[in-house]
């Protein structure tokens, strides 16, 4: 079909051709099937087939090329042998000669291309400077408009990658994304103005409106989210994920921020990691911090080397070298509370100026404000401590009610649980010194050791239930399981299993000494007794100033049998004692003060002379 002056004028055997317009398909001889609509469209084609040209001079110079489509004034104007091209729009692909497999849609799209292949340009002026580059995709007005030889580029959006000339392997999706990039390679921008100022920088990713918008020559920056890394113009190797993450950073290097507003105010701080909404959001120059959780380290500006994990942990401080892990751990810590470590829910929550504290466990050292050099390990250990310092609580509830007391050590479940102001105590074992409140300088080692002691001072109890009933007396020492268990008096010394145990609860004897298993174990009262040896003085209940020396001394197995009461007695050995040795003789004094029932001697000298001594 031919309509127009010289349309299909030279055709010989070409079939299924359509020519509409003056000189349309004028030189065609055997080419088939072609469609040409417009003045001079496909006018030079001879044997090329399956071409479609619509518009003045469209595909005008094509001779033997196949499968081309040109719609628009001068579209594919200079193409000669290039195949499988699509050009839609005035001047689209108008400089192409032998290039193949290109698609250009829009005025002047790919208008400078000569030999480049497999390019796609959709939008006016898109890829309009491209000459020999291959494998590029540009969608949007002016996208990749300056590219000449850069390859493997993807630009979607008005002016996307508009300044790119020779750079390769960039992806820009969004109006003005990567629009200043000239030679920078291997960048990805997704969102309005993402990586918009980058010129020669490489290996960066910006996803979101204005993401990494100010960067120019930097490397390895990643910004994902609205305004993420917005102002970064010199720092490198930063990662920002979230709305306004690292928004004000400019010069910081090696930072990672994931979460809304985290590290928002950072300027030159380096090597920080922030995960969670507003984590480290006011940090400016602080470096080497780790903050994980909503509002974690949110008050820090210049402090460095902090590790914070948990919602609002270390929320108020601008300080360094601090560890807070757990919800609101070190929540109120201020700028002078330094070198603290808090691990656990609300651990050291209210600390303000206290320094060099260690808290591990839920609510450990929770109420501490100014106390320093404390160590708390275990649920609620040292929970109520406020100003006390140099305390160590290890175990569930250990020293949990301590407030202002210092220099205490409690190890074990409920050890020194009730202590408030008692100082310089040591308790090791479950319930050891658990009821102590104000007593000081006590040492309790063993389950229930000094368990009932409240205000007593200077006591030592070592062994299960040793001195367990002692409450307010002091200066007592008990070593051995259940040694002094029922004793409530002071200044006693008990060494050995059940030594000084007492017949029943409430034994109030004082200043007694018992050494040996079961020694003085049946007493209820009595003072200044000394029992040394297994079972020595075992049966005495209320006597005072007695001395029992040797195994079973004073029992039914001893001389004169069991002694239950009495004062000022001395028992040496037991019924099996064979000999008693002493290097010198005993000195027995005769003193009127030690005698009773004294009467006059009236017998006279004759009676004395008559005596016959044997």
Predicted regions and their residues:
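Glycine- and small/polar-enriched repetitive beta-structure motifs of secreted/surface proteins
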Residues: 1-591
